[in-house]
């Protein structure tokens, strides 16, 4: 007989506060999430460049840790990667993600002078679908979503909680993505266009990596939607 218990788990994040002269009472918030096998530090390096000292930046680390096998040697020396969940009881992983996003938005608003009307989520790979689940469930909480090399939720048509959101979306696809074909990405574009407040969908000549050449456009896109 399967049962369960609930225990508190620490979820870690990196924080960077704005460096630009303060011309407003509150700052926009960029909440960034890494891909599968990534971590908060790797995503913060990208998010910092996007924010350019003009946003409160939080890089949240996935709650699930595992060893990344890197050849021979002692397992204790293997690098550690993090993820957001698997297909095993995925609803639990989704609830944790939603709860953490809400908690960080609240924290940034209360403690770090973030503007609750200027919240942007940015994700790479696996975390993209989690963010899409969030914004199409909580349709009025997020100003914009930046999704890089990711897909839409697998329950896009079946989940009764999803509906059109006031959220603007910038989706960056890789033309040479090993996981998502061009046809699959075009399908994502059609799906997102039906539910986003606006959609900017772009292909970059890249494999399944965060194309650094996209950072200037991401920055301008965020500025345009503030």
Residue ranges of predicted features:
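The feature captures the conserved acid-bearing segment of alpha/beta-hydrolase catalytic domains
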Residues: 150-226
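A generic structural signal for alpha->beta connector loops
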Residues: 54-57, 118, 141-142, 166, ...
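Conserved alpha/beta-hydrolase "nucleophile elbow" surrounding the catalytic nucleophile
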Residues: 34-36, 122-124, 174
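Hydrophobic/aromatic beta-strand patches that form the interior of the parallel beta-sheet core
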Residues: 31, 58-60, 120, 146, ...
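Primarily recognizes the serine-hydrolase "nucleophile elbow" in alpha/beta-hydrolase
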Residues: 117-164
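Serine-hydrolase catalytic machinery in alpha/beta-hydrolase-like enzymes
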Residues: 4-114, 118
């Amino acid at each position: 007989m399967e049962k369960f218990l609930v225990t508190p788990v620490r979820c870690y994040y990196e924080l960077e506060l704005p460096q630009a002269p303060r011309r407003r009472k509150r700052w926009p918030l960029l909440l960034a999430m890494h891909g599968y096998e990534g971590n908060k530090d790797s995503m913060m390096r990208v998010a910092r460049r996007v924010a350019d000292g003009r946003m409160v930046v939080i890089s949240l680390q996935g709650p699930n840790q595992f060893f990344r096998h890197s050849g021979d040697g002692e397992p204790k020396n293997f690098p550690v990667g993090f993820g957001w969940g698997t297909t095993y009881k995925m609803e639990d992983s989704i609830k944790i993600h939603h709860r953490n996003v809400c908690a960080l938005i609240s924290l940034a608003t209360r403690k770090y002078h973030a503007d609750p009307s200027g919240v942007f989520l940015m994700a790479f790979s696996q975390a993209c679908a989690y963010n899409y689940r969030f914004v199409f469930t909580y349709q009025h909480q997020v100003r914009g979503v930046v999704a890089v090399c990711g897909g839409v939720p697998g329950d896009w048509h079946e989940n009764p909680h999803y509906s059109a959101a006031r959220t603007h979306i910038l989706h960056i696809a890789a033309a040479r993505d090993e996981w998502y074909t061009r046809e699959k990405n075009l399908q994502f574009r059609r799906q997102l266009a039906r539910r986003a407040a606006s959609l900017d969908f772009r292909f970059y000549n890249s494999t399944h990596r965060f194309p650094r050449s996209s950072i200037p456009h991401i920055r301008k896109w965020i500025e345009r939607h503030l």
